[in-house]
Amino acid sequence: MKLSHLAAALSAQLVAPVAAGYLRQDILTAGTLRDTTVPAAPNEDLNQIVSDSQLLSLHRTICEIESVSNHESTVGEALIKYLGEHDFTTEKQIVPVDEDDDSTDERYNVWAYPKGSPKPKIILTSHIDTVPPHINYSLHAPEGDFDRANITIKGRGTVDAKASVAAMIIAALDHMKESPDVPVGLLFVVSEERGGTGMIHFSDSELNTSPPFFHTLIFGEPTELKLVDGHKGNLRFDVEAKGVSAHSGYPWLGHSAISEILPVLARIDGLGDIPVEDGGLPSSEKYGSTTLNIGTVRGGAAGNVVPESASASVAVRLADGTVEDAQDIIRKAVADASGGSKNITLKFPDDKAYPPIDLDTDVDGFELLTVNYGTDIPKLDIHDEDSDVKVKRYLYGPGTILVAHGVDEGLTVGDLEKAVEGYSKLIDAAVKRG
């Protein structure tokens, strides 16, 4: 948002329409599909195809259940039941609802492991919450000749991240059939979409031992079936401006908070394009430029009233450096743009900020990808400083961020089935570590 657009938006006193607590994720390119087309009747029974597949039917079951953040208990119960029926010991890790939500749902993380193996060395983890609104599960046949792999599954959570949840479970079960004592655990957390409350709760619990009993973590998010070598850091902050209200016919009797905040926001908006030596935020060869998004702007009471207050919320995707360094750069930029005005206040309310996250990619057979969106990975503190074996972290999953959170969220049967193969490959590599 450049200054001319920003000024127009502010003068019209508009507020960007965003769901509270959620950040829009960045776009990746779509993946490719294998060619397995065969002629088939146009009235192919899509529901029967799903019912005949353990993977697809599990995916359908959990996607048909609404599980917007802070309302995950029903899908949690479905997973507890399913895993218990398939030789897993399951535990509920109760997680209080987020402070800014009035939900009364008694939701929880799901922790599961093979019977008799409460400390698995390999953990597969993803999240069971979704962004709002819930969109019903639906199946769509491919155009032209029928190809089972190109059946499209749509609905909220079909990609982000219940596709990962279902594929992880089936991959784990496949390994347990071959080797009942395979040391694999499953962790499905709540509120990833609202700041990672579920993963933070697990991280702070007695299950997160020091040193860790696990040596491999496999995280599930939509990555187009590619192995992610890292993602940008995350930082949020708010800017507030104070003014004095007055009749717009006599503006000299007041002081416009919007006029105070405009130059500050203009400066903030360009920090990702300014070299560090000139006061901008850092870039890197791996992650590109640091990006900023002025997500909400609020101010004023009416067009004929000098506004006494204005505010903006900003999300930053860090490409390099530390959170503390970025905060210092932002503080100086705001002070310079405002001339040190006492009417401008800068707040960093998010104690969940983190720098760029580098991940492991030492398993052959995957294309690599770097992403801009955030995950639960930095929310899990790993206490391996004094351990001879360092914990490896992988990020992989079916589907693309291109459609996650949107009205057309969905993926193909082929992508979902390939994800089981991908997770199995990662499990195999982890088993070889011992």
UniProtKB/Swiss-Prot annotation:
A GO MF label: metal ion binding
Record's keyword terms, sorted: Glycoprotein, Hydrolase, Metal-binding, Protease, Secreted, Signal, Zinc
Binding site for Zn(2+) 2: D160
Listed SUPFAM superfamilies: Bacterial exopeptidase dimerisation domain, Zn-dependent exopeptidases
Subcellular localization: Secreted
Name of one Pfam family that matches: M20_dimer
Binding residues annotated for Zn(2+) 1, in chain numbering: D160, E193
Gene Ontology biological process terms in this record: proteolysis
Residues in the signal sequence: 1-20
EC numbers on record: 3.4.17.-
Assigned GO CC terms: extracellular region
Family statement: Belongs to the peptidase M20A family.
Name the UniProt record assigns to this protein: Probable carboxypeptidase BDCG_03757
Lineage of source species: Eukaryota, Fungi, Dikarya, Ascomycota, Pezizomycotina
